[in-house]
């Protein structure tokens, strides 16, 4: 493209390419930019140093549900851009093409992430059982989707994957990284690592368990039922007295007025805090 107008976060210039083969026709939008990562300077786009001011977000669109629409994706990106952000991370799965198109138009940088789990289950029916057979095809599909989007600046192979502390996981880390580089040599590859999760993994413990997940789900249902009971108790007609809802056997029911105990930090909040305190001394390689 002679005298091309380059793409960057402040000037998201785009071009359209139309390919015709017989009766088939496809149109692709792309941008032209030079992306360089330098350990002394950092990341540069078209020779200009860029400091990432990013956010992580999931794919849902509020009351519209877990669907992706061009208008809603662009609205989200514009709101983030107006509030000072210039980068986003797809947590924790590859983002939609509609979102990438929005990032291209708005000038928002994207780190596209692969998965939230490798071969150690975090929940009973997650992707851990299928990853070994599908990760190569999955990564190829992600690169094919992302390749022509100037907004995509790097890939992530996972989020808080404790497997990176085990020999098998270390090998898989290298395999995934090398495979991504073979598909796309223009973008770097990273991985979300949690020091304390890795420590647990290195001694054969799992951060998540099916029992823990089921208990958490049960507690959520119990809390919802208690909240419903309290709300029911508050609705009182004029002239009626307030009573607790009782069960058939006369025991005190859902309308209990006992104050709730203050919840203690659990899950990743606790582990992250502890990891910060103990440092990387407990980081092991299995």
Regions found by a protein language model. Give the residues of each.
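Secreted/periplasmic carbohydrate-active enzymes, especially glycoside hydrolases
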Residues: 1-97, 101-102, 106-107, 153-154, ...
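Residue-level marker of intrinsically disordered, low-complexity segments enriched
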Residues: 18, 233-234, 241, 264, ...
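Substrate-binding/catalytic cleft of secreted carbohydrate-active enzymes
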Residues: 87-219, 264-286
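Composition-driven recognition of long, low-complexity, acid-poor segments enriched in small hydrophobic
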Residues: 213, 217-254, 274
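Aromatic-Pro/Gly-enriched surface loop or interdomain linker
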Residues: 258
